[in-house]
């Protein structure tokens, strides 16, 4: 798996973006061909897909957690399926206590706090485990562009700061798929940000299925200390903005690629940087699950999703998705 930081030309077009455009056209053709030839697997439960149309963090993991909490509160049997990015997974497996992020992925370990999680390598291997678990609902994390899995209900997550970047497909831009195509087909659209004031023009045609969401801290952290922040997630800027909005004294930060597997040398460097600033290391939950043996030395900022229209979510999920009917 290639791990990249979000380059500036993905947000604002420059000569590099235009030079890469021919490769983007090839990517578009291959994606179309793949979708045209695929025969989707239909699972024996309602499948709710949470995804995005661009590379990088858009808050979809927090949406998955929100849905998991919602279904659990309604006593609806559910299973979460994740792709196990950044792991050494060899076969599709149910995540158990004792699994590590390196074995089943950081997102899988994080999501396993909220329900049963299947770390999937191939779609075709999911069915036997679903037949064994017999859920009423399956939440699939980031399978939106996978044509081999049938979806009953789709939720698209959009980051309100980045939106759709420079509007080019990978690798010239951040897009996996044409935004209009994705948004037209979506059942719900989450506009996610730590600080949002208005709806972007691109999303106004979808106001009837748009939910504004904010990512807010959910744990108490001492605001009288200095912190050195680091992360290896798709959108580190949102993490740093959340820290600032929480009014923590951040004296420095370091960015790693998404789903980064930290080395001992990385930790030693981070400790050195924190010591220079008389600070404590602070990171995201997705990064924190990789440091279980260092729980007393690294602070984790837990966050949760706060949405403006829970009634719309309940109506769409429990009526259109035919849950509890």
Swiss-Prot record:
InterPro entries: LpxK (IPR003758), P-loop_NTPase (IPR027417)
Gene Ontology biological process terms in this record: lipid A biosynthetic process; lipopolysaccharide core region biosynthetic process
Enzyme class: transferase
EC number: 2.7.1.130
Gene Ontology CC, one term: plasma membrane
NCBIfam families, alphabetized: lpxK (TIGR00682)
PANTHER family given in the database record: TETRAACYLDISACCHARIDE 4'-KINASE, TETRAACYLDISACCHARIDE 4'-KINASE, MITOCHONDRIAL-RELATED
Similarity section: Belongs to the LpxK family.
Name of the protein this chain belongs to: Tetraacyldisaccharide 4'-kinase
Organism encoding this protein: Rickettsia prowazekii (strain Madrid E)
Origin organism lineage: Bacteria, Pseudomonadati, Pseudomonadota, Alphaproteobacteria, Rickettsiales
